[in-house]
């Protein structure tokens, strides 16, 4: 039995076009209030992005659901997340697949996310402090890659780490950003533009 706040959010997401019931179920199961500061707990089930410190945000539930749905995951999918952030998107993925790999540039966010995931008994996640532009070569190839910050162009390392028929979902751009879905077919990449979005930038190289 879900609360009225959760049911209200799920109904909003359905109205906005989210149809994958597995994704909606994962949204219902993950307590978003555990991934935000205490000052924002009362807003946790609103369909809005919230600050998490270090100039980063927790994405609005619609965007989390949309990007997750676009990955077309199965339980066996090998998934890479770029930008662990609060760990909320990571937790959604962890409910949908057997294992998630996640890279975070900011060490303090990585540690906070790991703690939250353990508190929720989500032990099927590997996190790494590193440059998201470089992906996670040692764990490649991946069936699905999701990027939760916007690079100005598509990182070539992430394309290289996609398995054949794998899917990459990410926001791309600086002033004007668009959500892209990229499917690999051999050495070709089929790129679809989904919708206009607004994300924090994917910072290259420098770790924090």
UniProtKB/Swiss-Prot annotation:
Family annotation (InterPro entries): PCMT, SAM-dependent_MTases_sf
GO biological process: methylation; protein modification process; protein repair
GO molecular function, one term: protein-L-isoaspartate (D-aspartate) O-methyltransferase activity
Record's keyword terms, sorted: Cytoplasm, Methyltransferase, S-adenosyl-L-methionine, Transferase
Catalytic activity field: [protein]-L-isoaspartate + S-adenosyl-L-methionine = [protein]-L-isoaspartate alpha-methyl ester + S-adenosyl-L-homocysteine
Classification via CDD domains: AdoMet_MTases (cd02440)
Stored Gene3D superfamilies: Vaccinia Virus protein VP39 (3.40.50.150)
Protein known as: Protein-L-isoaspartate O-methyltransferase
Organism: Klebsiella pneumoniae (strain 342)
Gene it is expressed from: pcm
């Amino acid at each position: 039995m879900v609360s009225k706040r959760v049911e209200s959010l799920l109904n909003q997401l359905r109205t906005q076009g989210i149809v994958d019931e597995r994704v909606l179920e994962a949204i219902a199961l993950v307590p978003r209030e555990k991934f935000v500061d205490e000052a924002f707990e009362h807003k946790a089930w609103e369909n809005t992005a919230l600050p998490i410190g270090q100039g980063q945000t927790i994405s609005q539930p619609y965007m989390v659901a949309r990007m997750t749905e676009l990955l077309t995951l199965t339980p066996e999918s090998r998934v890479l997340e770029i930008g662990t952030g609060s760990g909320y998107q990571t937790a959604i993925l962890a409910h949908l697949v057997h294992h998630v790999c996640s890279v975070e540039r900011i060490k303090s966010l990585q540690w906070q996310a790991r703690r939250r995931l353990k508190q929720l008994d989500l032990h099927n996640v590997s996190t790494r402090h590193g440059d998201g532009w470089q992906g996670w070569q040692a764990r490649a190839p991946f069936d699905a890659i999701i990027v939760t910050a916007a690079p100005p162009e598509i990182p070539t390392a992430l394309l290289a780490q996609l398995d054949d028929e794998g899917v990459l979902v990410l926001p791309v751009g600086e002033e004007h950003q668009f959500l892209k879905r990229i499917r690999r077919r051999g050495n070709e990449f089929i790129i679809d533009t989904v919708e206009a979005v607004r994300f924090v930038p994917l910072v290259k190289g420098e770790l924090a």
